[in-house]
Structures are given as structure tokens and as C-alpha cells.
UniProtKB/Swiss-Prot annotation:
UniProt record similarity statement: Belongs to the universal ribosomal protein uL23 family.
Chief site of localization: cytoplasm
Name the record gives this protein: Large ribosomal subunit protein uL23
One Pfam family here: Ribosomal_L23
Originating species: Saccharomyces cerevisiae (strain ATCC 204508 / S288c)
GO molecular function: RNA binding; rRNA binding; structural constituent of ribosome
Cross-link position per record: Glycyl lysine isopeptide (Lys-Gly) (interchain with G-Cter in SUMO): K61
Localization (cell): Cytoplasm
Domain of life: Eukaryota
Entry keyword set: Cytoplasm, Isopeptide bond, Ribonucleoprotein, Ribosomal protein, RNA-binding, rRNA-binding, Ubl conjugation
Function: Component of the ribosome, a large ribonucleoprotein complex responsible for the synthesis of proteins in the cell. The small ribosomal subunit (SSU) binds messenger RNAs (mRNAs) and translates the encoded message by selecting cognate aminoacyl-transfer RNA (tRNA) molecules. The large subunit (LSU) contains the ribosomal catalytic site termed the peptidyl transferase center (PTC), which catalyzes the formation of peptide bonds, thereby polymerizing the amino acids delivered by tRNAs into a polypeptide chain.
Subunit-structure text: Component of the large ribosomal subunit (LSU). Mature yeast ribosomes consist of a small (40S) and a large (60S) subunit. The 40S small subunit contains 1 molecule of ribosomal RNA (18S rRNA) and 33 different proteins (encoded by 57 genes). The large 60S subunit contains 3 rRNA molecules (25S, 5.8S and 5S rRNA) and 46 different proteins (encoded by 81 genes). uL23 is associated with the polypeptide exit tunnel.
Gene Ontology, cellular component aspect: cytosol; cytosolic large ribosomal subunit; preribosome, large subunit precursor
Length: 142
């Protein structure tokens, strides 16, 4: 009966021994870089703050007031766009979320600009299923 492949491989390994010659790795750079090691995610025993801070910029702080100038009214009538004065700290995502939350409408896009007097203005374009004129009436600035 012929020995199995596994047995012959084991025999060769025993004959060869464990002190074989290790192939040296060729280093191409003079700088030694430490290998990346496993970094586990932190699992703190307690929170670093006892009480989390309240929401600094809620929907009512994001949208300060609607702008009712003639040009803003033209945007409402012609472009399905509502115009608001918003907080300087608010970004487009926060403005979109605040309009959706306060006025129950879907927002297509938000354009913002910082005015020379130091306030931020937001042009909020509504989706086709909502009429900006109706929303402006509901808000009460027409």
C-alpha cells in the first residue's frame, strides 16, 4: 500500500527540519514604517459629558423670518420659491430640514447668500406638488 500524499508531505517536512533558511525581504526604502496594527473602537465606561448640550440650532432658530420684499414676492409668484432670512450658522441641509418640519412641504433645493448687512438669505425652491403662493398665505406673509 502506497503512502498518502499527506504522509509523504509530513515526512519531507520532518527530514527538512524547522531551521530552514528564511527568504530575506528586499527593502527598497531607507525609511522604516511600522506595520498597521488593530485599533479597537473605544468603549467608554461613562460619557465624557454628564448632560448632553441642548440643540443649539433647532428649526425655529434656523428660520428667523420670511422676507416680504417685492422681489421676494415675485419669486413666490413666478418661481415657486419661498424667501427667508435664516441664521448665519445654518447650512443648506438644516434650512431644508427646518422648512420641511415647520411648513410640511417638500423642498427641491436651497440657495443661500450672505447679505452685506451681515444676515443670511435663503431661496427655498419647492417641489412641483406644492404651490409657494398657498404656503406663503398659510404662513401669513402675503
Amino acid at each position: 500500500m502506497a503512502p498518502s500524499a499527506k504522509a509523504t508531505a509530513a515526512k519531507k517536512a520532518v527530514v527538512k527540519g524547522t531551521n530552514g533558511k528564511k527568504a530575506l525581504k528586499v527593502r527598497t526604502s531607507a525609511t522604516f514604517r511600522l506595520p498597521k496594527t488593530l485599533k479597537l473602537a473605544r468603549a467608554p465606561k461613562y460619557a465624557s459629558k454628564a448632560v448632553p448640550h441642548y440643540n443649539r440650532l433647532d428649526s425655529y432658530k434656523v428660520i428667523e423670518q420670511p422676507i416680504t420684499s417685492e422681489t421676494a414676492m415675485k419669486k413666490v409668484e413666478d418661481g415657486n420659491i419661498l424667501v427667508f432670512q435664516v441664521s448665519m450658522k445654518a447650512n443648506k441641509y438644516q434650512i431644508k430640514k427646518a422648512v420641511k418640519e415647520l411648513y410640511e412641504v417638500d423642498v427641491l433645493k436651497v440657495n443661500t447668500l450672505v447679505r452685506p448687512n451681515g444676515t443670511k438669505k435663503a431661496y427655498v425652491r419647492l417641489t412641483a406638488d406644492y404651490d409657494a403662493l398657498d404656503i406663503a398665505n398659510r404662513i401669513g406673509y402675503i
